[in-house]
Swiss-Prot record:
Family: Belongs to the universal ribosomal protein uL13 family.
SUPFAM superfamilies: Ribosomal protein L13 (SSF52161)
Function of the molecule: This protein is one of the early assembly proteins of the 50S ribosomal subunit, although it is not seen to bind rRNA by itself. It is important during the early stages of 50S assembly.
Record GO terms (molecular function): mRNA binding; structural constituent of ribosome
Ribonucleoprotein among keywords: yes
Glycosyltransferase is among the record's keywords: no
Subunit structure: Part of the 50S ribosomal subunit.
Gene3D superfamilies per the UniProt record, alphabetical: Ribosomal protein L13
Protein name from the UniProt record: Large ribosomal subunit protein uL13
Keywords: Ribonucleoprotein, Ribosomal protein
GO biological process: negative regulation of translation; translation
GO cellular component labels: cytosolic large ribosomal subunit
Length: 142
């Protein structure tokens, strides 16, 4: 019996919606990254994108434990000399709450073309509204 290998044509992708309200950032991000990669499926193949589409709502209500709300710093660099920028978790949550979950999940995905394709299947929204009702997403309880 030959080992089954998934191909892009044979992969079936489902849509799931995740409510991040009151959830811990790292715990929700690991589950999302696992499902984006497709590791929860029996037909998982490392070199093929077998993951599902994930819609995250209420990203503005995600939590972190301890003093990380004030102490966690996100860094970015413009590419110019002295162009490093930093922003705390609290300020980023008030300004762009989607970016918190996106950065956490992106760091858990593979680096390269396959990881970028997996990341494109993540849709994050600050509030409860999303525009993917036509895909009939199933509720995923994490």
């Amino acid at each position: 019996m030959k080992t089954f290998t998934a191909t892009p044509e044979t992969v079936t992708r489902d849509w799931f919606v995740v409510d991040a309200e009151g959830k811990t950032l790292g715990r929700i991000a690991t589950e999302i990254a696992t499902r984006l990669r497709g590791k929860h499926k029996p037909e998982y193949t490392p070199h093929v994108d077998t993951g599902d589409y994930i819609i995250v709502i209420n990203a503005e209500k995600v939590t972190v434990t301890g003093n990380k709300a004030a102490g966690k710093i996100y860094y970015s660099h413009s590419g110019f000399i002295g162009g490093i920028k930093q922003i705390s978790f609290e300020k980023l949550q008030a300004h762009k709450p989607e970016m918190i979950i996106e950065k956490a999940v992106k760091g858990m995905l593979p680096k390269g073309p396959l990881g970028r394709a997996m990341f494109r299947k993540l849709k994050v929204y600050a509030g409860t509204e999303h525009n993917h009702a036509a895909q009939q997403p199933q509720v995923l309880d994490i």
